[in-house]
Amino acid sequence: TGMLMLDRVLYTSTHYPANYGFIPRTYAEDGDPLDVLVLCSEAIYSLALVKCYPIGVISMLDNGAIDDKIIAIPFNDPTYNSYKDISELPRHIFDEMSHFFRVYKQLEGKETAIDEIKDSKAAVKIVEKCIDRYIDYFCKGKPQPEIKAHEEQPAEV
């Protein structure tokens, strides 16, 4: 429709550690477009398309389901474009991202955990797999799998 839909309001006082969005025309295992954190020296506006390359992936468990977060760098950002792999990031930047994803859903009563940190080659493979999945389900008409982990459950107070 060309309109934005608010996906979530964070329940915690934390904030996203980088520009957070999705990779268009991908379909991840959680039934959503593939998530991406774009490390950039500038804030990026909603609906902006940014040419990036992946440097790694934070593979998470979100209520028991896999939820990959691609970490990417804009080609034209001189502050960050010397980094080619997640292992090259300053430790503090990596620690901020890891901390955020461990706590950002706690007040919703949801459990998240970091399962694995993977390199740029693994990130490229995940992006390619999610592009292929998008083509299968949205271009070729393959039936979509039932995704149960994404259903909203009320939090207990």
Regions found by a protein language model. Give the residues of each.
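Hydrophobic N-terminal alpha-helices or hydrophobic patches in metabolic proteins across all domains
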Residues: 1-157
